[in-house]
Amino acid sequence: MIPTRKKFGREKTNASAPIRFLLRSSHTARKNPLTFSRIKRNLRMMKEKGYFLSIGAGPNQVPLISAAIGLGYSVIAVDRNNHAPGLKMSSLRIMESVTEYRKILKTVSEIPLQGEILGVGTRSYGKATYTASYIADKLKLRYASLESVGICSDKNLLKETAKKIGILTPENYDISTLKNQFPFVYKPSQGSGKEGIRTFHDPKEWESFLKSKKKNSRSRVSKKKTNADKEEWIAEEYIPGFEITVCGLIQNGKFFPASISHKDVTKYAPYLEIAHTLPFLRCELIGEILLNCRALAAATKMNDCPFVAEFRINPQGEIYLIEAVPEVGGEFLADTLIPNYFGSSYFENLVKLLTGEKIEPFLNYSKIPKKYAGIFFSAPPEGKSKLVEHSEFVIKGKEKIIFDRKLKQHGEILRTSEGNAIRTRSIGVLGPDQNDQTLENWKQSVLQRLEGKFESV
């Protein structure tokens, strides 16, 4: 397929084509010698550095694309949304879904490039990670192997792998013979974003759920099964305690930790994430946490890729693996919390990793400075409700707002069963250098000030 060039500000495209890519033109720049010389200099740099392929170009992908451009790479961005902000920043655009890995590979192979593709990556998750892995495999680039992605995307396979190397995981229960295993957690074997997760505390609650599920199944008019019908579900031991998130990178088999943050969730299922805070105060656990991460990376064959894992720590200090994937992870940790708290450039290191450059260790990830920081979310009450209004968030003392994003609009109907996607607002906050509150007290203060107004429907 031949690329079409912009002419006089318009793009000539074939609307019927299932996939297309567009070159940014320097036509108008020839009238300005300074601009033209800058473009020629950029082209020389591009030839020296080569290309970076970004699987996705949405808002969450912008930090990755920006880092690649900042390091001198010319970016090829893939996204089916013509208005994705990362497309405007990129030299080449492939208009396609990030899940269409074969089509993307075919198009990339047909582009008459002026240099080599030296790296591929994604800030997304799930199927986009598979696409990045597939293309990396075919183009002999760096990313987690397809085998590794397969293990980590299936909770049962991940548990089996973790158990073999001595990492604790919640025990699986046989759904057909549940008797005295209450409370237990019921969730999809694959998936993310907390959608569908529930906890059952007694047999009556479980029996009521099964009857309701059976009744709903019979009442469906369509013979087609929904995704929920087709999906495999698992029941597992409920682990009391708190959760942590570990972010890092793996290069040449070595794990580079970037942060260990404390995670808070709602008291009701599906346990929406409402806070990620620093510093992590349980210093005595850091060594074991990092040992688990290194062992897990080796056992799942993760290499030359990002790494994010979630653990649950019970009151006895025992560390249970909940999830681990070769992904950047979301929740504004890598792009906002880590750089603003530690001063580390996660995405610059990630691009270096994916293009074969040596990365430097993240500094200070385990130190406990006097300041606090966190990413906080406003979540609706359990069940179905309507957002009436957002709060007027007021800072206290020397607090500094990193960002403030309203994720939902007034009047929107929200169902907590849909997981993290129904949270209404997110805010990043740096606490004062000297704080007379405990981290827990400060956290609760921020969440109370952030809480919006909802009404039942």
Task: Please state what every model-predicted region is.
Residues 184, 256, 320-323:
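Protein kinase-like catalytic core scaffold
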Residues 9, 15-17, 28:
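Short hydrophobic alpha-helical segments enriched in small aliphatic residues
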Residues 223, 230, 238-302, 306, ...:
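ATP-dependent carboxylate/phosphate-activation module, predominantly the ATP-grasp catalytic core
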Residues 45, 351-457:
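Peripheral (often C-terminal) accessory segments that flank ATP-dependent C-N-forming ligase machineries
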Residues 13-21, 221:
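N-terminal amphipathic/hydrophobic targeting modules at extreme N-termini
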Residues 38-147, 408-412, 419-422, 431-456:
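ATP-binding N-terminal substructure of ATP-dependent carboxylate-amine bond-forming enzymes
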Residues 153-234, 239-240, 251-254, 279-291, ...:
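Active-site nucleotide/adenylate-binding loops and adjacent lid/helix of ATP-dependent enzymes
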